[in-house]
C-alpha cells in the first residue's frame, strides 16, 4: 500500500515519496511532508532553473541557490521566477 503524507505544497493528503531523495535534515523534511506530485513539479522547475541560469552543480553557490529555491517552492508557496519564461495559457 502506498504511503501517504500531508503535502505542504499541495495542502492535502497525497501519495508520499518512496524513499528520501535529498540528504540531511532537509531531505527528511521533504520525505515526511512532500508528495510525489509536488516533487515531480519541483523537478520540472529545477530543470528549467539549471538550464536558464546555467547552474553548475559542482559550484557550491549554485547548489545553495537551487536548494533555497527548492525550499521556497515546496514549503513557502513561492513560485520559481525564470526570467523571460511565460507559462502557456490554457
Swiss-Prot record:
InterPro entries referenced in this protein's UniProt entry, alphabetically: Fe_traffick_prot_YggX, Fe_traffick_prot_YggX_sf
Keyword Signal: no
SUPFAM superfamilies for the chain: YggX-like (SSF111148)
GO cellular component: cytosol
Annotated keywords: Iron
GO MF: iron ion binding
KW Iron (keyword) present: yes
Coiled coil regions in record: none
GO biological process, one term: cellular response to oxidative stress
PANTHER family: FE(2+)-TRAFFICKING PROTEIN-RELATED
Cited NCBIfam families: PRK05408.1
Family as reported in the entry's similarity comment: Belongs to the Fe(2+)-trafficking protein family.
Role, per record: Could be a mediator in iron transactions between iron acquisition and iron-requiring processes, such as synthesis and/or repair of Fe-S clusters in biosynthetic enzymes.
Protein name: Probable Fe(2+)-trafficking protein
Native organism: Haemophilus influenzae (strain PittEE)
Lineage: Bacteria, Pseudomonadati, Pseudomonadota, Gammaproteobacteria, Pasteurellales
Amino acid at each position: 500500500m502506498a504511503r501517504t503524507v500531508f503535502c505542504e505544497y499541495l495542502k492535502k493528503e497525497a501519495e508520499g515519496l518512496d524513499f528520501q531523495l535529498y540528504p540531511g535534515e532537509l531531505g527528511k523534511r521533504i520525505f515526511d511532508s512532500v508528495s510525489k506530485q509536488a516533487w515531480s513539479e519541483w523537478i520540472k522547475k529545477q530543470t528549467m532553473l539549471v538550464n536558464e541560469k546555467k547552474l553548475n552543480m559542482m559550484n557550491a553557490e549554485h547548489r545553495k541557490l537551487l536548494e533555497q529555491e527548492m525550499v521556497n517552492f515546496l514549503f513557502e508557496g513561492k513560485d520559481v521566477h525564470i526570467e523571460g519564461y511565460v507559462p502557456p495559457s490554457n
